[in-house]
Regions:
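Divalent metal-binding segments
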Residues: 2-4, 8-254, 275-315, 319-328, ...
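Short, solvent-exposed loop/turn segments at the edges of secondary structure
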Residues: 48-51, 232, 270, 351, ...
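Non-cysteine beta-strand/loop elements that form the S-adenosyl-L-methionine
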Residues: 265-285, 375-385
Length: 523
């Protein structure tokens, strides 16, 4: 590969490239494998900064400093880790944990009694792995003004009518977030958080990554522009403006997005807008069609009211923005497809590439409709491993769980698609994500929907050029072609030569960004 000015000048033999003139030969990767820099089409910058809080997830997980945090298999273990962290906090600080998910604990739900036992005086907040639910203790409920008379959808209650401390979706969580300052978002755009994210991305071979909910705050924008412009910052960032932040005011969001676009440079690309229609399947807040949740749980929560979605989609579509729309359940997917269809009928637009994010329960008919409308999908392949067994037994049941995150069906329907980690929901690692799509093995080893497996080549396309396409960046990244950024992932082995089962274990040896080789940073 010949590189000039950070871009790919040519690809071929030394003889075929000789016409470009003299060159300095860099053969440091002579015994490695170069592939296009990996593209994470759905993640969030807090994947780095979240580690300033206490990890209380079920699965083992490695932090940016290299420490392996053991997964917690009981409520008692969660409480013990929280108590250990609480003992080191300043007296007036809020204790914040993240990564918890009650679905792994045989039907038991966390409530105020569990967290009051951690601290009866200090406010305690535990964000679920999905980021769509949280648990808080009695002091936090009191400070947030949430009591038995609070009338907000998503405030769950105990048998005596008092709040249980479990808050489902953004309206219910807002009184708490308002007090603690939305730390799960702001840590992502702090300088330390950005640098930690860059380190994690580089370990994973990622050279382009999204921040798929960005509030466009002035301080965060300034930090993003400054840090990403540093020559050795190892990843290109593609943020999406959070429509939710602007409370149904598209004009205000679009004005702020236009300000952000003025900061764009080679490693910062504003222009997308994120809408969130429903919640989390494993949190039972996603909106699903008949026959509903397998365990009989009531249907989920509309984060955007159906009566409002058309107006929002139309406004952003008419403004020329590309929409990335969170739909987990198939009822939410149907609503989003219909909203995009109506927007296109009113205002036809070529090559819009509006993308449904997660899109986990879409069926073949919905994928065919998406293809006819020029829509894309970004499927949450990692869910198969982390929550596949729970979906099989509790949320969707065998039939529907076997067709979740249906990459093969999307491909047959002609829908351009990518696959993702949604980090920090699951760890950033596109080779693992590709492994999930190619193998569809759950954490117990069950194959969940063998007919929805895709080949390794298709899975790798989904985390390179496929993801770039969904971001409108396929002219710049995603493949090793003349004119594109000279971004590469350096591997120890050829991912197309190892068995599909070994794809997740191919070591990343380094990355190249704009022609600059970057050694893996220690940590």
């Amino acid at each position: 590969v010949a590189v000039r000015d950070g871009r790919i000048l040519g690809v071929g033999s030394k003889e075929s490239l000789a016409g470009w003139g003299s060159a300095e030969v860099d053969d440091r990767y002579a015994d490695k494998v170069l592939m296009p820099g990996l593209v994470e089409g759905h993640c969030h910058l807090p994947e780095g900064g979240m580690w300033k809080f206490v990890y209380v997830g079920f699965y083992d997980r490695r932090g940016p400093d290299g420490r392996l945090w053991e997964g917690l298999k009981s409520f008692e273990a969660v409480a013990a880790r929280l108590r250990e962290a609480e003992s080191a906090l300043a007296p007036d600080a809020t204790l914040i944990g993240w990564g918890f998910d009650p679905i792994f604990f045989e039907g038991r739900r966390m409530d105020v009694r569990d967290l009051d036992a951690v601290s009866p005086r200090r406010p305690v907040v535990v964000m679920h792995a999905s980021m769509h639910l949280m648990n808080v203790n009695t002091p936090m409920l009191a400070r947030a003004g949430i009591d038995r008379d609070t009338d907000i959808e998503g405030v769950t209650r105990m048998e005596n009518g008092e709040p249980s401390g479990e808050l489902c979706e953004f309206a219910a969580m807002f009184p708490v977030m308002r007090l603690i300052g939305s730390p799960f978002r702001t840590v992502g755009v702090s300088e330390d958080g950005l640098r930690m994210f860059g380190k994690v991305a580089q370990w994973a071979g990622v050279t382009t990554a999204t921040d798929l909910v960005n509030e466009l705050g002035d301080e965060g924008l300034a930090t993003l522009a400054r840090v990403t412009a540093e020559p050795d910052y190892p990843v290109r960032i593609v943020p999406a403006a959070s429509a939710l932040t602007y409370a149904g005011d598209p004009a205000r969001c679009l004005a702020k997005l236009e300000e952000a676009r003025r900061l764009n440079h080679g490693k910062l690309h504003f222009g997308m807008v994120k809408l969130v229609v429903d919640g989390s399947i494993q949190g039972f807040t996603a909106r699903v069609r008949w026959p509903g949740y397998y365990n009989g749980a009531p249907n989920g929560i509309w984060v955007i009211a159906p009566s409002e979605l058309d107006t929002l989609v139309q406004a952003y579509h008419d403004a020329g923005a590309q929409l990335h729309i969170h739909t987990n359940g198939d009822e939410a997917t149907q609503l989003a497809i219909e909203a995009v269809d109506r927007a296109l009928r009113r205002s036809p637009r070529r090559d819009h590439r509006h993308t449904l994010q997660h899109c986990q329960m879409a069926d073949a008919a919905q994928f065919r409709r998406m293809a006819s409308l020029g829509m894309c999908a970004n499927l949450f392949a990692n869910h198969i491993f982390y929550w596949g067994d729970a979906h099989y037994a509790l949320t969707m049941g065998p039939d529907r769980a076997n067709r979740m995150d249906a990459c093969a069906t999307a491909a047959r329907a002609g829908v351009p698609f990518s696959i993702h980690s949604d980090a920090p929901i699951t760890p950033l690692g596109p080779l693992f994500t590709a492994w999930c799509a190619a193998n569809r093995r759950t954490s117990s080893g069950r194959v969940l929907g063998e007919s929805e497996r895709i080949g390794v080549d298709a899975a790798l396309h989904a985390v390179t050029l496929g993801a770039a396409y969904t971001l409108h960046l396929d002219h710049l990244v995603g493949s090793i072609e003349v004119g594109k950024y000279a971004d590469f992932c350096v591997l120890e082995d050829d991912p197309l030569a190892v068995p599909a089962e070994g794809l997740k274990d191919v070591p990343v040896a380094g990355t190249v960004i704009g022609g600059r080789p970057l050694a893996l940073r220690e940590g």
